[in-house]
Amino acid sequence: MRAFVGTVPFTIIEAVHFVIANNYDDADLYMVKVFDGAEDVCERVRQTGVFKNVYLVEDVLLTYPITIEKCIRTVKNGKAFLKSTRNRIYDEVYYNNSGWLINSIFYTAFSRANKNIKNKFLEHGFNSYTTVYSDKPFYLRVLIRLVGLKCMDGTMLDEIHMFHPELMHMKHYGRIVKMTPMDRKNTRLVEALNHIFNYHPETDEFADRDIIIMEQGPQKFTFDKEGFWKKVLKNIDKQKTIIKPHPRQKNSTLGENGIKISTNYTLPWEVEILNIDIEKKTQITIFSGACV
């Protein structure tokens, strides 16, 4: 049996793609509630039949800005998850997050039942190519151990699956494995993702827009985002533009600029481009790797 961890929509896409590409019939998905509509998405994942079991997990993803309240909630939910998975045994577990805390929660849960479990990473965008996962503040390891978790610091990784392994030059643990590219001609993949994220070609909000603004989710550093977008919005045709909020946003931060805002917050851009031709469209973003 294999376990996959899904948080933001892109990680769910990766898990679905990986299972279909490898024809697995023994995979479970653990989907963490980190975005609006997660419950509905989880149910639609079940309906596709891609996974043997799909479990909805209370939020254990610590996001910025980090607060004491968030830390307490994450640890509390993590403890409940450990209790609920006590009798589940897996041979392999696939992670696709850069956070030590969330990965340590799943690592602790699954490694206690099988000490020889294979730990594997699926890349999570450009961050996998530019950041050393094992490079974290020393106190984080201490805190994770203090709350009774085994620290998933990367040293126990067996494999890292990447779409472009030739671009990986960062320090890492585990063998690098090339992932099968996503293919819009793969009918099963496209139909599954369209259903999961409630995509319907006849109601596509981006088809008649030439400019797509991709908003960014919460970051651990500050920058003049308002000033950046103010300059951009002065130089574009607003009637030909649409804003795509980040899946973790509750509301768009650009909502009062007279520009149409996409209503399907949870629709990942990767699903959109599997269905339409974006060659002649202009994408504007600050950090979003989906544009690449």
Task: Cite the ranges covered by each PLM segment.
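Glycine-rich phosphate-binding "P-loop"
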Residues: 1-4, 63-70, 213-220, 250-265
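Short hydrophobic beta-strand segments
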Residues: 1-7, 29-31, 89-97, 162, ...
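Active-site and donor-binding regions of nucleotide-sugar-utilizing enzymes
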Residues: 4-153, 291
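Active-site-adjacent loop/helix micro-motif of nuclease/hydrolase catalytic cores
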Residues: 11-14, 221-227, 270-274
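Short boundary motifs at domain starts and secondary-structure transition points
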Residues: 19-21, 82-86, 196-207, 275
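A nucleotide-sugar donor-handling region in carbohydrate enzymes
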Residues: 124, 129-209
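Conserved catalytic-core segment of nucleotide-activated headgroup transferases in glycan assembly
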Residues: 195-197, 201, 207-245, 249
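Donor nucleotide-activated moiety binding/catalytic core segment of transferases
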Residues: 247-292
